[in-house]
UniProtKB/Swiss-Prot annotation:
Sequence positions that bind Zn(2+) 3: H151
Binding residues annotated for Zn(2+) 2, in chain numbering: H107
Organism: Choloepus hoffmanni
Gene that this sequence comes from: CRYAA
Protein name: Alpha-crystallin A chain
Subcellular location: Cytoplasm; Nucleus
Binding residue positions for Zn(2+) 1: H100, E102
GO biological process, alphabetically ordered: lens development in camera-type eye; negative regulation of apoptotic process; protein refolding; response to heat
Organismal lineage: Eukaryota, Metazoa, Chordata, Craniata, Vertebrata
Residues in the signal sequence: none
Comp. bias intervals (Basic and acidic residues): 148-164
Positions of glycan attachment: S159
């Protein structure tokens, strides 16, 4: 039985499942060895893999939900205070802007700024929109949808006919 042995260089952890954190919104929190040299960890230990779940959590989660009754946006803004955030509705868009000036942290000085824009569904009641910031830094923007009575759900009964269908058979 032949076993293929690969040089560690060919087992590098490069690609979309092992992105660098250098350019995400949390770049000021400090760096790990694999942020600077993502292939180094797999060269030293080919069985080491960065958790994909950890990568998703570190990316600044933004989630949009639009169901029948309401429209909701969840946005992770844990590095911003309510005074640093501006939420505006312009026509059919909601714009969320966050900016804080340079301040000192454990690694030096840092300033952050982001701008997100989401399209509002036409059925959202813009007079009843609300926005809140949780203690853990999750911004929730929501609005109820206007239910159109002409588009309400109703059940259509199925009747059984005694004669065969006149549709052509294939």
């Amino acid at each position: 039985m032949d076993v293929t042995i690969q040089h560690p260089w060919f087992r590098r952890a490069l690609g979309p499942f092992y992105p660098s954190r250098l350019f995400d919104q949390f770049f000021g929190e400090g760096l790990f060895e694999y942020d600077l040299l993502p292939f180094l960890s797999s060269t030293i230990s080919p069985y080491y893999r960065q958790s994909l779940f950890r990568t998703v959590l570190d990316s600044g989660i933004s989630e949009v939900r639009s169901d029948r009754d309401k429209f909701v946006i969840f946005l992770d803004v844990k590095h911003f205070s309510p005074e640093d955030l501006t939420v505006k509705v312009l026509d059919d868009f909601v714009e969320i802007h966050g900016k804080h000036n340079e301040r000192q942290d454990d690694h030096g000085y840092i300033s952050r700024e982001f701008h997100r824009r989401y399209r509002l569904p036409t059925a959202v009641d813009q007079s009843a929109l609300s926005c809140s910031l949780s203690a853990d830094g999750m911004l929730t923007f929501s609005g109820p949808k206007i239910v159109d009575p002409s588009h309400s759900e109703r059940t259509i009964p199925v009747s059984r006919e005694e004669k065969p269908s006149s549709a052509p058979s294939s």
